[in-house]
């Protein structure tokens, strides 16, 4: 199977982005990773992202500071005055853990690195259960890809398209876990907890989803 040339993967340190990183290693010749320190409550995830990038032997791992998020209020992930919810995500509205425009900002920054590195794929691990978040939906990914192509120096010079690689859009978290098992992802070295505690709290929405997805695997 022919491999694509290069990709930069958004790597949080969680099971979804780790699986995407291992999938990228299989599908691409050159793999870069990028992580973000945006004042998140669960900043400990960056420690896991660094270890995963090292294990995956990526070309380079960039950790980017996004300090302005600490000025925003209302999200449980960046505002310590907002309590992290327990239990499942709400079904029909964005949860209190939504960080405004996070994936738009992250994809924009990653696209600048992709432009500079001259790789034309940007990987993001959004999946079917992420749909309560507006910036995880298929229509957002399509729009983001269009905007990146409209503004890319790489595209203008090379006459090649940029692609937002989001292979998990139609997959459940369990599907991702099973794929990760097949790829040999070290799930024990991933981290998913909105509280940012070690060990994880086991009660927040992402802890619950992780436990259900990895049942019988980890």
UniProtKB/Swiss-Prot annotation:
It catalyses: 7-carboxy-7-deazaguanine + NH4(+) + ATP = 7-cyano-7-deazaguanine + ADP + phosphate + H2O + H(+). Pfam families: QueC. It is an enzyme of class 6 (ligase). Zn(2+) binds at residues 193, 201, 204, 207. The gene is queC. It comes from the Bacteria. Keywords: ATP-binding, Ligase, Metal-binding, Nucleotide-binding, Queuosine biosynthesis, Zinc. The keyword GTP-binding does not apply. The keyword ATP-binding applies. Binds 1 zinc ion per subunit. Catalyzes the ATP-dependent conversion of 7-carboxy-7-deazaguanine (CDG) to 7-cyano-7-deazaguanine (preQ(0)). One of its GO terms (biological process) is queuosine biosynthetic process. Its cofactor is Zn(2+). Its EC number is 6.3.4.20. This is 7-cyano-7-deazaguanine synthase. Belongs to the QueC family. GO terms for molecular function: ATP binding; ligase activity, forming carbon-nitrogen bonds; zinc ion binding. ATP binds at residues 11-21. NCBIfam families: 7-cyano-7-deazaguanine synthase QueC. Pathway: Purine metabolism; 7-cyano-7-deazaguanine biosynthesis. It comes from Aquifex aeolicus (strain VF5). The lineage of its organism: Bacteria, Pseudomonadati, Aquificota, Aquificia, Aquificales.
């Amino acid at each position: 199977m022919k491999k694509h040339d290069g990709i930069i993967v958004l790597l949080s340190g969680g099971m979804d982005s780790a699986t995407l990183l291992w999938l990228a290693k299989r599908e691409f010749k050159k793999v870069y990773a990028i992580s973000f320190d945006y004042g998140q409550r669960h900043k400990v995830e960056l420690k896991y992202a660094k270890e995963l990038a090292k294990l995956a032997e990526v070309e380079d791992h960039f950790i980017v500071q996004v300090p302005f998020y600490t000025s925003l209020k209302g999200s449980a992930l960046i505002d310590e005055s907002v309590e992290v919810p327990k239990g499942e995500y709400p079904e029909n509205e964005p949860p209190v853990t939504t960080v405004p425009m996070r994936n738009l900002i992250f994809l924009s920054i990653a696209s600048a690195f992709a432009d500079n590195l001259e790789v034309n794929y940007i990987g993001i691990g959004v999946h079917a259960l992420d749909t309560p978040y507006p910036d995880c939906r298929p229509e957002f990914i399509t729009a983001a890809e269009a905007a990146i192509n409209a503004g890319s120096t790489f595209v203008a010079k090379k006459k090649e398209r940029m692609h937002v690689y989001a292979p998990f859009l139609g997959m459940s978290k369990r599907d991702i876990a099973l794929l990760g098992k097949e790829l040999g992802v070290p799930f024990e070295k991933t981290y998913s907890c909105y509280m940012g505690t070690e060990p994880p709290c086991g009660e927040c929405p992402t802890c619950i989803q992780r436990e259900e997805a990895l049942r019988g695997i980890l």
